[in-house]
Regions:
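Polytopic alpha-helical membrane proteins, predominantly small-molecule transporters/carriers
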Residues: 1-285
């Protein structure tokens, strides 16, 4: 049962991280430099947080480093696409596209390649969240909105790949390292890539105001701890159970946060959130 508590906490943290991501984009734009600056700071800070949580001990294997490197590339693309998509999406709609990809692809991966059971509650959960997502999508008006649709699909696919890589790593016990070491290695890879990008492209390291660093530190804490909790849960829970819970939970928390921030989600979004909540409860019990 405690693993479900971990996932609920992770849901809340992932929902909050969207808020800090959105604030960064508003102040710094959504260009390539901004995306790499965002990733450099957040992953550097997250690495330090995980290093402390792991007792200043890190383990490495060739398999973990390889998966971490691929994972890092996916995260960079995901970060850039996320910043670009915020130019038209509100918090609840963006999170729905992100989390749906994070649910469906790992779900299918677990069922097809790891022979996880495809039960009636799981099928009902997938169907309900699919309906919720379709209801929540609000077609943009104008060429700018249509042009950003590609970024919605990008975060859909890339977040799904994050789940697949996590499942792949955690399912190979003889080759993988502990969850804290793996996520710290991922963060270190992203930080190194972003630092190299700035040194080659701009010949300098971007410096941000203390207030902005604080905002990114909040994002890093939410992302780093949330991903760590998910990896710990994934050592026991099937991907076909875990990722629907994450998806439904984030949809619910994100919509609540949107209401608190007076973004006024539509009636369809509220109904979709209720459906997501029911589907999450269904797969847990």
């Amino acid at each position: 049962m405690y693993l479900y508590v971990f996932l609920i906490i992770a849901d809340l943290l992932f929902s909050l991280q969207f808020l800090f991501n959105q604030q960064f984009r508003k102040r710094n734009g959504d260009g390539l430099d901004s995306a790499f600056t965002f990733s450099m700071y957040t992953n550097g800070i997250s690495f330090l947080i995980l290093l402390v949580l792991n007792g200043f001990k890190l383990s490495f294997t060739w398999f973990s480093v390889l998966i971490a490197f691929i994972y890092a590339l996916v995260l960079l693309l995901y970060s850039y696409s996320g910043l670009k998509s915020f130019s038209t999406a509100n918090l609840s709609v963006y999170s729905i596209f992100t989390m749906l990809g994070g649910m469906l692809l790992p779900f299918a991966f677990g069922v097809i390649f790891y022979k996880e059971d495809f039960t009636l509650p799981k099928a009902a959960c997938i169907l309900l969240i699919g309906i919720a997502t379709a209801m929540s999508f609000e077609k943009g008006k104008g060429s700018k909105d249509r042009g950003n649709l590609k970024y919605y699909f990008a975060v859909f696919i890339l977040n799904g790949l994050v789940g697949i890589l996590s499942k792949l790593h955690q399912s190979n016990a003889e080759l993988c390292v502990d969850s804290g070491s793996f996520m710290a290695t991922v963060n270190l890879c992203v930080f190194a890539m972003c630092l190299g990008f700035h040194l080659v492209r701009n010949k300098k390291v971007p410096l941000l105001p203390i207030k902005e660093v604080g905002n990114l530190a909040c994002y890093a804490a939410c992302s780093g701890i949330g991903n760590l909790l998910c990896l710990i849960a994934l050592t026991t829970l099937p991907a076909s159970v875990q990722y629907p819970i994450i998806t439904g939970g984030v949809m619910v928390f994100s919509t609540v946060i949107s209401i608190i921030r007076k973004e006024k989600p539509s009636v369809k979004t509220l109904i979709a959130t209720a459906i997501a909540f029911v589907s999450t409860i269904l797969i847990m019990f």
